[in-house]
Amino acid sequence: MDPNTVSSFQVDCFLWHVRKQVADQELGDAPFLDRLRRDQKSLKGRGSTLGLNIETATCVGKQIVERILKEESDEALKMTMASAPASRYLTDMTIEEMSRDWFMLMPKQKVAGPLCVRMDQAIMDKNIILKANFSVIFDRLETLILLRAFTEEGAIVGEISPLPSLPGHTNEDVKNAIGVLIGGLEWNDNTVRVSKTLQRFAWKSSNENGRPPLTPKQKRKMARTIRSEVRRNKMAD
């Protein structure tokens, strides 16, 4: 096993412990608490994958951090903080919308890289909007916290979330997963649009109809689907 992978996990466990102490003292805001819950699931998944005990890893991570802090001067710390780019946390959804339980009559689940796509295939002929909570850096989507698909009535009919066992994903991973979700929902004649905030930071553009631009791969797949539908209609006639 790569020692850097182990030490990274150990430090992440200790830093999560510190953040949990902050939350316990009621010093964290909503985005802080949201990330804390998500990261806890991620750490459990990583610990299981690596075969490492979280409590033991937390103790070792504390030793690593203490050693680094002892060696680093205050001036070096100030320079590091000044040069580090700051990320922003953007929210389309309220805490209630993010934490609400939902159920699927005809569940479908697909893994798209490090992301899990879930949708209810029983939903038909609905107007659906995709909302997401995510962090942004350099005006680009950095990390997806959670994306959900809502009908006009407010029902949740789809979701994209990071896989705890595969931490880390790119902007392209998110766009590909959104393409999978849109394709699945539109198969049942639903009309899907993406929130303006998500369009802006994932695709750096926005369309009035709420549709993000398709990638060449998605365009080819859609063309194949249309040709298949045309052939079936001709055979039926």
UniProtKB/Swiss-Prot annotation:
Signal peptide: none annotated. Residues 205-237 are annotated as: Disordered. Belongs to the influenza A viruses NS1 family. Residues 223-230 are annotated as: PABPN1-binding. Upon interferon induction, ISGylated via host HERC5; this results in the impairment of NS1 interaction with RNA targets due to its inability to form homodimers and to interact with host EIF2AK2/PKR. This is Non-structural protein 1. It comes from Influenza A virus (strain A/India/6263/1980 H1N1). Its main location: host cell. The gene is NS.
